[in-house]
Regions:
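Substrate-binding strand-loop-helix patch
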Residues: 20-22, 48-56, 76-94, 144
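Amphipathic terminal alpha-helices
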Residues: 138-153
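NAD(P)-dependent short-chain dehydrogenase/reductase
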Residues: 1-50, 57
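A hydrophobic C-terminal alpha-helical subdomain
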Residues: 108-130, 135
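A general structural signal for well-ordered alpha-helical segments in protein cores
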Residues: 25-32, 55, 59, 84-88, ...
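Mid/C-terminal beta-alpha module of Rossmann-like enzyme folds, strongest
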Residues: 61, 68-114, 118, 153
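Amphipathic alpha-helical segments that line or abut small-molecule/effector binding pockets
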Residues: 56-64, 139, 143
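Short aromatic/basic micro-patch
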Residues: 10, 52, 81, 104, ...
Length: 153
């Protein structure tokens, strides 16, 4: 891209979570929330780390990107590096759901899913330094989800 364009920006958000439209595919937070709410067991991997991004943080970052117009690759991710099992425990805690339903497994439990490296986190230095957006911790993002749920109830 840099060979054909004089100026470019690639915006790379990582795995996002937050309330989504009912007609769309669930994200990790909504999927875990729904399963635990129904009292169903959830198997979550503990051997792949990512830094999940609250969807409102993504919007905030995109807005800053449009205003400041940096060039190059901008990663957009959350503050905390967690695996899906740890993320599930956060969901259970914040929403007051039964964490004992969450089962720790490794990626080999899901052979149909593409192999991933153990660390899939994205670096957020440019997000912080050039856009002025601070990555949101998982607990804070989930509490914002819970507050939004109460606001619409």
């Amino acid at each position: 891209m840099s060979e054909t364009l004089e100026r470019f920006t690639i915006f790379r958000p990582i795995l996002m979570y937050g309330w989504n439209h009912a007609a769309t595919r669930p994200n990790p937070a909504t999927w875990i929330y729904e399963k635990l709410l129904r009292g169903e067991a959830v198997e979550l991997v503990d051997d792949v780390t990512e830094n999940p991004l609250y969807n409102h943080s993504c919007g905030e970052t995109l807005w800053a990107l449009l205003k400041r117009q940096p060039e190059g690759i901008i990663h957009c991710a959350g503050h905390d590096a967690v695996n899906r099992y740890e993320f599930g425990l956060f969901v259970a805690k914040v929403f007051g759901l039964d964490a004992s339903l969450i089962k720790r497994v490794d990626s080999s439990r899901f052979p149909g899913i593409a192999a991933r490296p153990p660390n899939t986190t994205l670096a957020t230095q440019r997000m912080r330094r050039e856009l002025g957006v601070q990555p949101l911790p998982v607990g804070k993002g989930l509490r914002a989800m819970k507050a939004a749920m109460r606001a619409t109830a």
